[in-house]
Amino acid sequence: MAGSLKNIHRLFLKSLLCCLGCMLRVVELLEGEPLPQSGVPNSLEKLSKKYGSVFTVWLGSTPVVVVSGYQAIKEAFVNQGEEFSGRANYPVIMTISQGYGVLVSSGKRWKDLRRMSLMTLKNFGMGRRTIEQRIQEETKFLIEAIHEYGVVNPKKMICNSIGNVISSIVFGHRFEYNDPMFQLIQKNFPLLSVTYCTKLMHYHAHFTNKTFSFFIPFFQMFNMFPRIVWWFPGKHHRMFAIINQAKDYMRAQAELRLKNLDTSDPQDLLEAFLIKMLEEKDDPNTEFCYDNMVMTAWNLFSAGTETTSSTLRQSFLMMMKYPSIQGKVQKEIDDVIGSRVPTVDDRVKMPYTDAVLHEVQRFMDLAPTSVPHKVIRDTEFHNYLIPEGTMVLPLFSSVLSDPELFKNPDEFDPENFLDENGCFKKNDGFLPFGLGKRVCLGEALARMELFLFFTSLLQRFTFSGTQPPEEINVDPECASFGRIPQSYECYIKVRTVE
């Protein structure tokens, strides 16, 4: 009898998912026709060309205001940054976070947690030597791991390395790559990422296609029917249990630190947060509690691991596609760095390498709409009144592909960031980290990681594809609201520098 009920539940669940697939299409309001299934950002770009810089679409039953183009985005998220600073919530996100953490919160909670997170990163050396040394240490472990392979899909190795940089900030130490707890953490944090970028986990090294065939529609269904989903059996129960296991580990680590806490010298994010908790323990309105600490640590992992590792994977894919560009980068590395360990200070002396990394991020367009915002009050914008709580998407891809800002927006061309003298040239349209009050708080860390990992690996290795360059597809995969690199295997050969 129990087995029959379970099968009935599963059949009903599948029926709901099939219906959901039809309901979740972005619908063009004026004509009532479903948009092309080429990814939400691509579809929104087409609408912006038709309806202008501000328009509304519906995602299922949810109205969403889209802001497109550099000028309109700047007006909204810089000039009216406070009004547009809220974070839109989804039921699945709220179930995982309960509204805690810097990424999903709004108002006072978000401001307090963001200020504390930025100060902690600064104190631990974001842009200074200490974090730089942690990254340099991790590049050595990655280089040793690469030496063990011939043909390889590099995504798991790269993801482990970036995850360990975050681990050193959160926990004060790195893990061995095969450490069971580290692998649990690496499995779990993309789960939070996927709630923002459906399909992202489909390409993650730790999950199978079969797993994703469930989770992709599940997250969508959960957002529409959060109370109903709990009545059905399935992998989602196991998923939430695993997530809670990782969260429990973080809390346990914090409680261990509390026993021997040196309040004058915090060694990691958890200790810095504990000190803040002790300082404000008598404040009934404090936002510094265990729940916010755990979810803020989660946010650093989920936002910092997959994004940076995906960008690095795209970088090496571009080098395989364009071996002449790879050769120029390696020559600049040889001329400026030689055989010593790369440092952040080298970047200003390496305009071509810097331009290549900027162009990879522009071309890839990892987060075309960022994490969805909401307006925190009724807001007038471009002669429209946007009601409080309305979801807002900044269409950053409309800026990164603007021909008025980039001379070759549809091609991979490092010249977009070089002047006529070969010097690095900044561009206001370079917005891969967002804009305004909710700009990525780990931007400086990500820039440091990208430069040091990229130069360290190309200093020692040459990347080549398992097929000719002209057959390599470098176009990122559309993944609902985001873009991710093509999955690939490659040859990583040790360089012989004369």
Where are these regions (language model features)?
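Conserved cytochrome P450 catalytic core segment spanning the I/J/K helices
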Residues: 122-126, 198-202, 214-218, 239-312, ...
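Conserved cytochrome P450 K-helix/beta-meander segment immediately N-terminal to the heme-binding cysteine loop
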Residues: 394-421
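Conserved cytochrome P450 K-helix E-x-x-R motif and the immediately C-terminal K′/meander segment
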Residues: 33-52, 245-248, 252, 340-383, ...
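Cytochrome P450
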Residues: 2-21, 58-65, 125-137, 146-168, ...
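Central I-helix of cytochrome P450 enzymes
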Residues: 162, 166, 171, 242-250, ...
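Cytochrome P450 heme-thiolate "Cys pocket" and heme-binding signature region
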Residues: 382, 420-450, 475-479
